[in-house]
């Protein structure tokens, strides 16, 4: 008679993490971040208007688990202009501190941050697999942000024949 050792590891003990509490905390954090956005957006539009910028375009592209903003362009009417070297307050939450942190960011950096935030909120994982591309328009005159989002996907069609 031979003695056979088990080949499977012993089962793991039950988790001691309260996942319901983790989800509640994440939901509360997301709500706090969402509550900061209107004031950040208003400060951005005020800064763009003061600089004479009528709108900003942001193009992005990604696929294969990698994506980024390709270009951020500022416009005064139909004329491309440079962003001025000014900073505005931007309210944010960091991972390691529950308090709101006020940062001084350039207008261009605030545009970039908001674009990434809105992409994550509306189309999380946009850069994965076949990816996506598109454009934001931050319209300072209308005080609105417009997103055109193009999702790539692989499709297949089945054809059957009998001969």
Q: What are these model-predicted stretches?
A:
Residues 127, 132-163:
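Acidic, proline/glycine-rich low-complexity IDRs
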Residues 24-27, 45, 122-127, 132-133, ...:
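Active-site-adjacent core segments of small-molecule enzymes
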Residues 83-129:
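Short, hydrophobic/π-rich interface segment
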Residues 55-97, 101:
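An N-terminal amphipathic alpha-helical segment
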Residues 45-54, 107-110, 139-145:
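A short, structured loop/turn motif at beta-sheet edges
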Residues 35-49, 122:
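Phosphate-interacting basic helix/loop segments used at nucleotide- and nucleic-acid interfaces
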Residues 1-37, 95-98, 163:
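Non-catalytic accessory regions used for complex assembly or targeting
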Residues 18-21, 43, 110, 114:
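Exposed alpha-helical structural elements
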């Amino acid at each position: 008679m031979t003695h056979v050792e088990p080949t499977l590891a012993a089962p793991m003990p039950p988790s001691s993490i309260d996942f319901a509490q983790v989800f509640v905390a994440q939901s509360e954090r997301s709500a706090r971040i969402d509550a900061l956005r209107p004031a950040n957006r208003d400060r951005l539009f005020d800064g763009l208007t003061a600089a004479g910028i009528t709108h900003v375009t942001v193009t992005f592209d990604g696929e294969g688990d990698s994506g980024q903003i390709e270009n951020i362009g500022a416009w005064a009417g139909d004329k491309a202009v440079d962003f001025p070297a000014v900073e505005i307050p931007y309210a944010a939450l960091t991972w390691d501190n529950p308090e709101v942190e006020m940062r001084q960011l350039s207008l261009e950096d605030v545009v970039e941050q908001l674009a990434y935030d809105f992409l994550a909120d509306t189309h999380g994982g946009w850069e994965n697999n076949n990816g996506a591309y598109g454009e934001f328009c931050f319209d300072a005159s209308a005080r609105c942000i417009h997103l055109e989002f193009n999702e790539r996907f692989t499709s297949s069609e089945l054809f059957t024949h009998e001969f």
